[in-house]
């Protein structure tokens, strides 16, 4: 499979692959602002996660005496541009890289997007010799690299050969895919406030990329759920309880669950609940990161930025006006002055700055 449209972001952790889109709708080439929003969402997640994924080799070999057996793994995922299952014959992955295929198509209904981790399978072949097949399989299980160390357990491949010899392989993150609805009323530009009545593309990208990281349907996720109760210690420590906070669909957290945003500490509906209010934008919250820790990731610590506190006294008030003007005039990069959080301090920050001064 070619990697046309392969885009590494933020230290080559999550890597976005637009090749399926390029071969079909070519939506993201024609809509660079939408592409920038997806890349920003991936970069923000990369900044939050400490990736510790070991490299995965395509073929796992086990030996016992002169008996040798190969397990040739494959990855599969839902092609975001067509909805068809796509097979990747070479199931190898570089260290600390997780590839996500991104595309658009008409989804129907009210769905704005879908995201998820891909699947895994293998074909077995070998030569029987002086050792037992069971010992060769056990050696292959010990040698296999597809668990990848950190992150969630996506699936465990269990079974037995015709002679009854059992096998079991734990598989972590291989590839994932994200698809967006192509006819929703979207707001694409993540650097400006969301237009009234529009769905924020960045927020949906953030949500769906988290699904590819093991949220919903993976073995690690399922091990944390009993009914609507979450069992993970990190979420319980962050929220105070795990009771009644899982949505009935078993794929999300409950609607309207609130947590402090990691950038500024403001309470916000978490990214991993099932709904997005039109005309609004979400950012990662402390509870979203707690979920990722329960799924096997390490996350970075964040000191929330008080947007508008340009004089850094812990308050936003009239005393920040003169410093804000100075930073603005100098084209500075002070994070507290970048009120619209687009990575630059310029005239686009003036209206948001006035808003935070007014307590909006």
Q: For each predicted feature, which ranges?
A:
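Extracellular zinc-dependent metalloprotease catalytic-domain scaffold
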Residues: 11-206, 211-304
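Cellulosome-associated attachment modules in secreted, modular CAZymes
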Residues: 292, 300-360
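Preference for short coil/turn "hinge" residues that link or interrupt alpha-helices
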Residues: 7, 265, 277-280, 309, ...
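Sec-dependent, cleavable N-terminal signal peptides
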Residues: 1-12
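Compositionally biased, intrinsically disordered low-complexity regions enriched in proline and serine
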Residues: 7, 162, 189, 240, ...
